[in-house]
UniProtKB/Swiss-Prot annotation:
Pfam families: MFS_1. Proton-associated glucose and sucrose transporter. May be able to transport also fructose. Expressed at a late melanosome maturation stage where functions as proton/glucose exporter which increase lumenal pH by decreasing glycolysis. Regulates melanogenesis by maintaining melanosome neutralization that is initially initiated by transient OCA2 and required for a proper function of the tyrosinase TYR. Gene3D superfamilies: MFS general substrate transporter like domains. This is Membrane-associated transporter protein. Belongs to the glycoside-pentoside-hexuronide (GPH) cation symporter transporter (TC 2.A.2) family. It is a multi-pass membrane protein. It comes from Homo sapiens (Human). Glycans are attached at residue 356. The gene is SLC45A2.
Length: 530
């Protein structure tokens, strides 16, 4: 056993706790270059998000989508994501692919993003070339475009959970924190580049004339960036399949051994058990002791048991999910209506006037400036994610979490009360603070919770382990699906508020109020590990 564990390229990483079957294992320190490569997925994802934000409304309008169907487009994707995120997250915890647990899901969702972009940016052009009947052409163009938007949104929202779980699987605790900061950094860079390319008038450039329309130009760039970024990401750090843990290790029955999860690990809080093939031999021996029992456990994991695990999650996980929901509700309330706010309130344009009127042209100018504001948000998100590494040593995760919500709440409040072009653009930098906070701090807290639970198991080896089917994939997915729930709340509630108040100012004020409520929640209810 000892000689096998000492083979080249395979080292044992033990905790400082007492030796025993509950020893944690720590993957090696990852080079910064590998963490940057891992973060390229966030760059590609956010680039494509920015392209969608800039072009999806013009695309939907150009194909003739009735306004009555808008709600279906924006509701279907988050509803599907909210229902399926924990299911797929748990399935990835138990995936036995030879390529690892997370990468097969990331690759599949990346392909779905690419197909979705191809459908909503090129679908109408392809349909026009294939169908001559005007009525059938309209129906098919709308259908293909809607399917593309829903497919892209679903995959892009979904993929964040597996990417985070992949990072947690293969990195040490310190590298997880560094990796999350790099994720936020490249998220901002990707969004900024996407908004900048979307602001270029491609119709008057050679590339635009060569490819046909600006929609095809943006698909070319999106497909290129997404393919390159995800290829680099998937090759960044290797994953060991779960079956490799038990390879070449004889089974050893122990009557008092606690039940194992389907992947041969003590499931709840399993973030530090076996990662990237670096195996504690005593732990691996227990993990391999009864393969048939593990397979039966995996097959017994039903949707009912999964929902039970979600309902019975520990209170500190539940509070973290609620705080994440509050934060994303505030953030999306502002971001989804920000360009319209700039056009109508700051520039005092009218989107409902004739398209050749002065009021409509002023509104369009406001929308363009609003896009530059979103670009400022992305740039400052990247900058703040870099400074987070310095700030966390002074104010901790609680200070970072509270500060992000507070600055966003105050900034959006000032924008709503005093709408001015220059002050609004300056305050857009605070949107970036909130964005970086939402992408890093909650997931840092997840790693802290898992690390704390691992230490508790080491200190009490005779205690009963948690028998739930929870794992880090499910925890990341549950946290991520709060984004979909926030989209559902925003899509269903803000339209009613705007119609009732008669102005989009209510959107910005609502975002400010929700963020300030979130300040109180993260300070009073979210638990922080010392």
């Amino acid at each position: 056993m000892g000689s096998n564990s000492g083979q080249a390229g395979r080292h044992i990483y033990k905790s400082l706790a007492d030796d025993g079957p509950f020893d944690s294992v720590e993957p090696p320190k990852r080079p910064t270059s590998r963490l940057i490569m891992h973060s390229m997925a966030m760059f590609g994802r956010e680039f494509c998000y920015a392209v969608e934000a800039a072009y999806v409304t013009p695309v939907l309008l150009s194909v003739g989508l009735p306004s009555s169907l808008y709600s279906i487009v924006w509701f279907l994707s988050p509803i599907l994501g909210f229902l399926l995120q924990p299911v797929v997250g748990s399935a990835s915890d138990h995936c036995r692919s030879r390529w690892g647990r997370r990468r097969p899901y990331i690759l599949t969702l990346g392909v779905m993003m690419l197909v979705g972009m191809a459908l909503y940016l090129n679908g109408a052009t392809v349909v026009a070339a294939l169908i001559a009947n005007p009525r059938r052409k309209l129906v098919w163009a709308i259908s293909v475009t809607m399917i593309g938007v829903v497919l892209f949104d679903f995959a892009a929202d979904f993929i964040d959970g597996p990417i985070k779980a992949y990072l947690f699987d293969v990195c040490s605790h310190q590298d997880k924190e560094k990796g999350l900061h790099y994720h936020a950094l490249f998220t901002g860079f990707g969004g900024a580049l996407g908004y900048l390319l979307g602001a270029i008038d491609w119709a008057h450039l050679e590339l635009g004339r060569l490819l046909g329309t600006e929609f095809q130009v943006m698909f070319f760039f999106s497909a290129l960036v997404l393919t390159l970024c995800f290829t680099v990401h998937l090759c960044s750090i290797s994953e060991a399949p779960l079956t490799e843990v038990a390879k070449g290790i004889p089974p050893q029955q122990t009557p008092q051994d606690p039940p194992l999860s389907s992947d041969g690990m003590y499931e709840y809080g399993s973030i530090e058990k076996v990662k990237n093939g670096y195996v504690n031999p005593e732990l691996a021996m227990q993990g391999a002791k009864n393969k048939n029992h593990a397979e039966q456990t995996r097959r017994a994991m039903t949707l009912k048991s999964l929902l039970r695990a979600l309902v019975n999650m520990p209170p500190h996980y539940r509070y973290l999910c609620i705080s994440h929901l509050i934060g994303w509700t505030a953030f999306l309330s502002n971001m989804l209506f920000f360009t319209d706010f700039m056009g109508q309130i700051v520039y005092r344009g009218d989107p409902y006037s004739a398209h050749n009127s002065t009021e409509f042209l002023i509104y369009e100018r406001g929308v363009e400036v609003g896009c530059w504001g979103l670009c400022i948000n992305s740039v400052f998100s990247s900058l703040y994610s870099y400074f987070q590494k310095v700030l966390v040593s002074y104010i901790g995760l609680k200070g970072l979490y509270f500060t992000g919500y507070l600055l966003f709440g105050l900034g959006t409040g000032f924008i709503g009360l005093f709408p001015n072009v220059y002050s609004t653009l300056v305050l857009c930098s605070l949107f970036g603070v909130m964005s970086s906070t939402l992408y890093t701090v909650p997931f840092n807290l997840i790693t802290e919770y898992h690390r704390e639970e691992e230490k508790e198991r080491q200190q009490a080896p005779g205690g009963d382990p948690d028998n739930s089917v929870r794992g880090k994939g499910m925890d990341c997915a549950t946290l991520t699906c709060m984004v979909q729930l926030a989209q559902i709340l925003v899509g269903g509630g803000l339209g009613f508020l705007v119609n009732t108040a008669g102005t989009v100012v209510v959107v910005v004020i609502t975002a400010s109020a929700v963020a300030l409520i979130g300040c109180c929640f993260v300070a009073l209810f979210v638990r922080y590990v010392d």
